[in-house]
Amino acid sequence: MRSCRPAKGYFSPHPLPAKLVRGMICGMLDPFDPDRFIVRAEVHILGIEPKISRTLELPITLNLAQLHEVLQAAFGWTDSHLHQFNIGGLVYGAPEFDEDGLSDSRTFEATEVRMIDLQFPYDPEENPLTILYEYDFGDNWRHLLRLERVARQEGVKYPRCLAGKRSGPPEDVGGTSGYADFLDAWLDPDHEEHKAMRRWVGRKFHPEACNLDEINKAIGKALRASKGDYRFRRESHRD
């Protein structure tokens, strides 16, 4: 007889009642089955209009360190700065970057939390599951992820970027206000900084471009290099 116990490793700072959890597990589709479900993430960078966004589909076994690699590739970041995830008031990332305890919150290990460990609501429209991903604490890029569990499609390779709008900002541009100033100069041929900004980002950059093929290639490359952990850790071990 099939067990109705919650899946091993189920994580939630606010657990569901046992009766509801049993109902989820004992339905026609097991919501913890990685062969049946994936996570769809609608992601956009806060403070920028029109929105810079990506629709990502992720294996439910993906951990937060791997999610970091996916987000870096999806938005064209170069992983040159610190980052963290904020989930329900808890901070996840690479604890070794806060060994002096200077952060306001303790940083928990990102590799120890997977998508499958998160508590997905019954009604994502009424009560969506959201994660805040922060990158570059100087420029303060804040990405809001809205997550929902959806059925896995046969023959599809995950993770993947399904849709997107606009190019990610250049690194070290100065946050949302700096990016607005940059675009003013980049778009206006009469601006005194126009040529300098065009040279700085190169010919391939266009603020309205979003090449899904290139993004998905970058995602695949990043995950192959990370092998379940942060790439910077693996690279430092090779050194």
Annotate each PLM feature.
Residues R2, G9-D239:
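Short linear regulatory motifs enriched in tryptophan with gly/pro/ser
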